[in-house]
């Protein structure tokens, strides 16, 4: 107590004057006014507290129980100043808008075009921050899309529009309290502080909207074209089989040794099949040996058998020319006239049914004319007599 009985008044030591104007101008509260610091003397008379603008005036009273101690109040002020330093942007990153939105209440703010100047992007990751402050959009609905800009320098001037309804309350809540669950953890994010004029501040880490790839775009895998594979040269040999002869067998072999496949209708009687007695063909009979051989076999026909002979099995190259085919047709009708009526009809039918299959083989083997024989006969004897292999 003083000598005159009045309580002692202690003046607070001067604060540090090295604060930036930004730290001094950022505040909390919705009344948009900066109350002056005032001195409050408690009823005890021995405590002097300097009250700043961190708490509304209605929270103070003259009782010691409701008053925060001086040390705790100073600690709280230091914590708040540290939070303000974290949320304060450097001077070079802040671009003031060219238009100040109207200070009317909600629903009266229209669209404003804010030009944003973008400097050199030093970090490889640029943040695209397009924030639409609409009336139905909460703080949780603000998304930040990051893209890789590499080492390129982006110096465009971009304008974007947005409805600034309800921007003052939303931005103050998002930037003033760092411990809220809605605060983003992106290091280079767009921080917005709304002073009394409602201005929006955007950082310089802003990439043009054209560089953002659309999220709905999907990667399309190109399937290689497999139709360009070279086709193999396949030689097709059509063996036409008569419908009246279901027992006739046809085969196609890819072996180089089995070059030619010929189907012969061999008709043997039961007695000749048992005795294995046949007249051999000599060189003189080789000119029309095919016709004579077929005539002798069909003379005493009892039953017919379909036999398939290949070049490897019989060791013969069976080659038919067009001239020999015509000769067989003509001679078959002439030489079978002396036979009985039943056998003549059967022998002529056998020759005429089998000739289409032989003709088709001749047509498909035109490119192998060097292997064809002359008009000397149907068979070219290689090693053995044909009678040794006939069944």
From Swiss-Prot:
Pfam families with a match to the protein in the record: CABS1
Location of the region described as Disordered in the Swiss-Prot/TrEMBL record: 1-23, 90-110, 152-221, 271-299, 330-351
UniProt-listed InterPro entries: Ca-bd_spermatid
Biased composition (Acidic residues): 278-287
Any one GO MF annotation of this record: calcium ion binding
Factors inducing expression: Down-regulated by Busulfan.
Gene Ontology terms: biological process: flagellated sperm motility; spermatogenesis
GO cellular component: acrosomal vesicle; mitochondrial inner membrane; motile cilium; sperm principal piece
Residues modified to Phosphoserine: 253, 269, 314, 347, 357, 372, 376
Tissue: Detected only in testis. Expressed from stages X to VIII of the seminiferous epithelial cycle. Expressed from step 13 to step 16 of spermatid development (at protein level).
Compartments, as annotated in UniProt: Cytoplasm; Mitochondrion inner membrane; Cell projection, Cilium, Flagellum; Cytoplasmic vesicle, Secretory vesicle, Acrosome
Biased composition (Low complexity): 90-101
PANTHER family with a match to the protein in the record: CALCIUM-BINDING AND SPERMATID-SPECIFIC PROTEIN 1, TESTIS DEVELOPMENT PROTEIN NYD-SP26
Protein name per its UniProtKB record: Calcium-binding and spermatid-specific protein 1
Organism (species): Mus musculus (Mouse)
Gene name of this polypeptide: Cabs1
């Amino acid at each position: 107590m003083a000598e005159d009985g009045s309580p002692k008044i202690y003046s607070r030591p001067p604060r540090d004057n090295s604060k930036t104007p930004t730290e001094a101008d950022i505040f909390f509260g919705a009344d948009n006014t900066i109350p002056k610091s005032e001195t409050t003397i408690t009823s005890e008379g021995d405590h002097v507290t300097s009250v700043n603008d961190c708490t509304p005036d209605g929270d103070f009273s003259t009782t010691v129980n409701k008053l925060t101690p001086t040390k705790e109040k100073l600690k709280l002020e230091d914590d708040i100043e540290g939070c303000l330093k974290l949320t304060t942007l450097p001077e070079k990153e802040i671009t003031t808008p060219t238009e100040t939105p109207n200070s009317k209440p909600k629903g009266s703010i229209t669209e404003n075009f804010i030009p944003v100047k973008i400097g050199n992007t030093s970090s490889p990751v640029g943040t695209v921050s397009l924030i639409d402050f609409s009336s139905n959009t909460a703080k949780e609905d603000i998304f930040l899309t990051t893209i890789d800009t590499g080492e390129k320098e982006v110096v465009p001037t971009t304008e974007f529009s947005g409805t600034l309804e309800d921007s003052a309350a939303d931005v103050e809540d998002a930037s003033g309290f760092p411990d809220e669950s809605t605060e983003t953890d992106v290091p280079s994010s767009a921080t917005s502080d709304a002073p009394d004029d409602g201005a929006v501040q955007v950082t310089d880490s802003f990439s043009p909207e054209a560089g953002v790839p659309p999220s709905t775009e999907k990667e399309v895998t190109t399937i290689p074209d497999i139709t360009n594979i070279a086709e193999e040269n396949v030689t097709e040999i059509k063996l036409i089989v008569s419908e009246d002869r279901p027992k006739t067998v046809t085969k196609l072999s890819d072996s180089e040794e089995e070059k030619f496949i010929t189907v012969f209708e061999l008709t043997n009687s039961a007695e000749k099949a048992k005795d294995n007695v046949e007249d051999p063909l000599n060189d003189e009979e080789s000119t029309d040996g095919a016709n004579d051989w077929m005539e002798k076999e069909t003379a005493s026909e009892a039953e017919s058998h379909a036999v398939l002979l290949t070049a490897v099995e019989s060791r013969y190259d069976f080659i038919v020319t067009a001239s020999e085919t015509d000769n067989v047709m003509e001679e078959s009708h002439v030489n079978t006239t002396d036979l009985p009526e039943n056998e003549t009809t059967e022998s002529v039918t056998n020759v005429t049914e089998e000739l289409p299959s032989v003709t088709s083989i001749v047509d498909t083997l035109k490119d192998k004319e060097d292997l064809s024989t002359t008009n000397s006969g149907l068979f070219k004897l290689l090693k053995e007599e044909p009678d040794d292999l006939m069944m």
